[in-house]
Amino acid sequence: MFRNVQDILLLGRGFSYAVANETELKIMEASYTNAKAYSSCDYPHGPIATTKRFIPVIFFLTDEKTNDSTIKLVEKIKKDFSVSTLVVTNNEKYITMANEAVLLPKEAEGVAGVFGMAVFSQLFACLLSLARGYNPDEPIGLSKTTVTF
C-alpha cells in the first residue's frame, strides 16, 4: 500500500497528533516520501479538499478522550474519497474501520499510547525506506543539530 506512493497523510488528535507530526518527519527523513500530518479536528476545515484517492492515510487512535473526531474522519474519508487507510490503534473495535490496521496492546492508551505509536512510527519509516531501496541509517542531507540565529 505504501511502497510506491509519493505522498502519505497522517491524522490524529491530542497525543496522537504529536506522534503524527514526528512520524511525518521520520517518513520524509528515511524514505524521501512526502508526508503531511494534520490534527483530525482541523483537517475537515480546509486541508480535506486536498484529499486524493491515490494518497493513503494513516490514522492514529489510542486515546478514547480524543478518538471521536478521528473516527468520524476515517468514516468520511473512506466514504467520500475511497482512499487506502491504515489505523494504528489499541482498540480491537477500530481495526475493521480501515483497509489495514496495526493493533497495539490495549494498555497503550492516552500517554502510554505515545510509546506504542512511536515504536510503530520508527519501524514504519525504517521498513518503508528499505522497501524503497534506501538506507535508513544514512539519510541524505540530515543535520543532527539545529542552528539558532
Located regions from the model:
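A SIS-like phosphosugar-recognition module
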Residues: 1-149
